[in-house]
């Protein structure tokens, strides 16, 4: 029987928290659900996680890569691994275009 992986600890960047507060309650619920899935399994299929192009992360823990994940058809959030091992830093969230512009 495979060992169950521990969930990642979450680190929230200021811009993530500011943009999260601007979302409608239903949008916040979608982000909440997606973040829970990410914490438990960053490869969860519905998150459609992929690397952001031409963006460097702040933390070397994850190889300086930044990732984009889907919370819904129109909502995205960005993250990277770090700042410490076993942590995920949530960088930004919101509607598709603005979120990916301000990675």
What positions do the PLM features span?
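Enriched for short, Lys/Arg-rich terminal
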Residues: 1-4, 18, 22, 64-103
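Arg/Lys-rich, positively charged N-terminal/basic patches that mediate binding to nucleic acids
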Residues: 1-36
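Context-gated lysine
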Residues: 4, 24, 33, 51, ...
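Solvent-exposed, flexible loop/coil residues
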Residues: 14, 56, 103
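A short beta-strand-loop micro-motif that forms or neighbors metal/cofactor-
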Residues: 28-43, 49, 84-85
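A short, surface-exposed loop/turn module that caps and links secondary-structure elements
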Residues: 40-69
């Amino acid at each position: 029987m495979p060992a169950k992986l521990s969930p990642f600890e979450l680190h929230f960047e200021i811009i993530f928290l500011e943009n999260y507060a601007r979302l409608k309650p239903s949008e916040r619920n979608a982000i909440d659900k997606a973040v829970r899935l990410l914490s438990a399994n960053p490869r969860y299929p519905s998150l459609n996680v992929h690397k952001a192009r031409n963006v460097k992360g702040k933390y070397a823990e994850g190889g300086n890569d930044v990732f984009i994940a889907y919370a819904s058809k129109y909502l995205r959030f960005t993250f990277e691994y770090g700042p410490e091992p076993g942590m995920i830093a949530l960088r930004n969230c919101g509607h598709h275009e603005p979120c990916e512009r301000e990675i």
